[in-house]
Design a protein with these regions (language model features):
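Exposed, interaction-prone extracellular/peripheral surfaces
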Residues: 1-128
Length: 128
């Protein structure tokens, strides 16, 4: 569903721009950044690191990533985050949240350990 969007910008591109903005903000704060690519399963994990070179690698991966599935399971991604990231972090969950299973319980558990900020990207035309 991320390929849907207006003729000006797809949701995928919008998510990539948001992620890039957050990544460059992380550089300014000397923070680590990593990415979990997911569909209805974990497709790729880039562990958190610092540095401009790492951020550029992440952005390149964001631009080139093609999910194997067109389904979404946010709960799976949140559970994975909780299992692989041991130290408390701020995690931005970027998704359109369409076709998701109920992910409230995994999100509640993740929020006990991390500060999870959900960012929903949508296109008004989907609702029309």
């Amino acid at each position: 569903s991320l390929e849907f969007g207006s003729h000006v910008q797809t949701k995928r591109r919008m998510l990539t721009e948001i992620a890039a903005t957050l990544a460059f903000s992380a550089i300014q704060n000397n923070d680590k950044i990593g990415v979990i690519f997911f569909s209805d399963r974990i497709e790729k994990f880039i562990p958190p690191k610092k540095g401009r070179k790492h951020i550029l690698y992440i952005i390149r991966e964001l631009l080139e990533f093609k999910p194997e599935s067109n389904r979404t399971d946010v709960g799976c991604a949140v559970e994975y985050l909780t299992s692989v990231i041991k130290r408390r972090c701020t995690a931005f969950l970027l998704s359109d949240f369409i076709d998701d299973k109920d992910f409230r319980q995994p999100l509640t558990i993740a929020n006990r350990k991390h500060d999870v900020v959900a960012v929903q990207v949508y296109d008004r035309r989907v609702a029309e």
